[in-house]
């Protein structure tokens, strides 16, 4: 039982996101190994209709 809020205080000096090597945005999560902008390393680029401008 150590994956809650108490653990977050121990990782406050580390980087959560680094630059993604596919899209170039600063959205690659180091812990989950996934880019929140393009979905890397998934083979398809992440895109949703609600995210596009109307």
UniProtKB/Swiss-Prot annotation:
Zn(2+) binds at residues 20, 23, 35, 38. InterPro entries: Ribosomal_eL37 (IPR001569), Ribosomal_eL37/eL43 (IPR011331), Ribosomal_eL37_CS (IPR018267), Ribosomal_zn-bd (IPR011332). Binds 1 zinc ion per subunit. SUPFAM superfamilies: Zn-binding ribosomal proteins. One of its GO terms (cellular component) is cytosolic large ribosomal subunit. Coiled coil: none annotated. Signal peptide: none annotated. Keywords: Metal-binding, Ribonucleoprotein, Ribosomal protein, RNA-binding, rRNA-binding, Zinc, Zinc-finger. Its cofactor is Zn(2+). GO terms for biological process: translation. One of its GO terms (molecular function) is zinc ion binding. A zinc finger (C4-type) spans 20-38. It holds the Pfam family Ribosomal_L37e. PANTHER family: 60S RIBOSOMAL PROTEIN L37, RIBOSOMAL PROTEIN L37. Binds to the 23S rRNA. Belongs to the eukaryotic ribosomal protein eL37 family. This is Large ribosomal subunit protein eL37. It comes from Thermoplasma acidophilum (strain ATCC 25905 / DSM 1728 / JCM 9062 / NBRC 15155 / AMRC-C165). The lineage of its organism: Archaea, Methanobacteriati, Thermoplasmatota, Thermoplasmata, Thermoplasmatales. The gene is rpl37e.
């Amino acid at each position: 039982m150590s994956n809650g809020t108490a653990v977050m205080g121990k990782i406050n000096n580390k980087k959560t996101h680094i630059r993604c090597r596919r899209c170039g945005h600063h959205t690659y999560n180091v812990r989950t190994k996934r880019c929140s902008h393009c979905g890397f390393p998934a083979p398809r680029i992440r895109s949703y209709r609600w995210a596009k401008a109307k």
